[in-house]
């Protein structure tokens, strides 16, 4: 069950902090998927262990596919393992918390939001007594970034946006995916986070890499693509990006982009 990480796990684990977005809950008896409903066998958490995961992002829109109870039990497993999480939680209050991590004298603030389900569907979002993703609002984003900047933290913002499986016109799934950015609003939303003070903004929804840019005083990566999600229908969904952030004196001084490909 560590097979997916056999060639990349050591590289990922070498970081002081390894952050991954996982949007599939672990379900006993999981036998695969039907349509767009996903789960994972519990033993595949060994892949995350082999990758040296420290922080799990929970902004994804599939963690509640088998019900929030499995999302809850999955989060409880992360807690048991001593892993931190953000962008989702055991309830809406827990999901909205900003994760602060101090590493080698640097303060980092991780904050994540599910933009897509806030706008189009609520099934993936946390409720007052149910697990799920953190909802998005400009007011919440503004408040979170201001508080983090006031504390002198490096602000890392992540978004779950519209997912695109492939951009070529011959095999595109959704018409909106004909363009590099999935929605006209994506650039606006991501740039607004930088305008509010974010140091780096990352789209963790993409099934294949999207564009990136230096904008104002920040960096924006609109989509990193797949890591362990096994979509081999198109070459695009077998590709991904791993970001290595180098931080000194609570400033991002370098970002290294490592391209990856799933060799099935």
Language model segments and positions:
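Acidic, metal/ion-coordinating pockets
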Residues: 1-264
């Amino acid at each position: 069950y560590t097979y997916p990480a056999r060639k990349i796990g050591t590289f990922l684990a070498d970081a002081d902090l390894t952050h991954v977005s996982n949007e599939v809950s672990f379900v006993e008896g999981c036998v695969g998927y039907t349509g767009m409903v996903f789960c994972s066998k519990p033993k595949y958490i060994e892949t995350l262990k082999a990758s040296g995961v420290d922080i799990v992002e929970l902004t994804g829109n599939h963690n509640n596919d088998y019900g929030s109870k499995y999302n809850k039990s999955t989060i409880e497993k992360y807690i048991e393992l001593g892993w931190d999480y953000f962008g989702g939680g055991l309830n809406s209050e827990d999901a909205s918390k900003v994760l602060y991590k101090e590493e080698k004298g640097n303060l980092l603030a991780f904050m994540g939001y599910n933009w897509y389900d806030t706008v189009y569907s609520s099934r993936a979002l946390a409720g007052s007594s149910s697990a799920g993703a953190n909802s998005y609002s400009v007011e919440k984003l503004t408040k979170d970034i201001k508080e983090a900047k006031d504390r002198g933290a490096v602000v890392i913002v992540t978004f779950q946006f519209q997912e695109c499986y492939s951009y070529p016109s011959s095999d595109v799934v959704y018409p909106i995916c004909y363009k590099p950015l999935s929605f006209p609003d994506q650039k606006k939303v991501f740039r607004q986070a930088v305008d509010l003070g974010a140091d780096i903004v990352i789209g963790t929804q993409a099934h294949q890499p999207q564009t990136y840019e230096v904008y104002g005083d920040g960096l924006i990566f609109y989509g990193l693509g797949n890591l362990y999600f096994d979509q081999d229908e198109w070459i695009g969904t077998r590709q991904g990006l791993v970001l290595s952030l180098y931080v000194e004196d609570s400033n991002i001084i370098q970002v290294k982009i490592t391209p990856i490909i799933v060799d099935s």
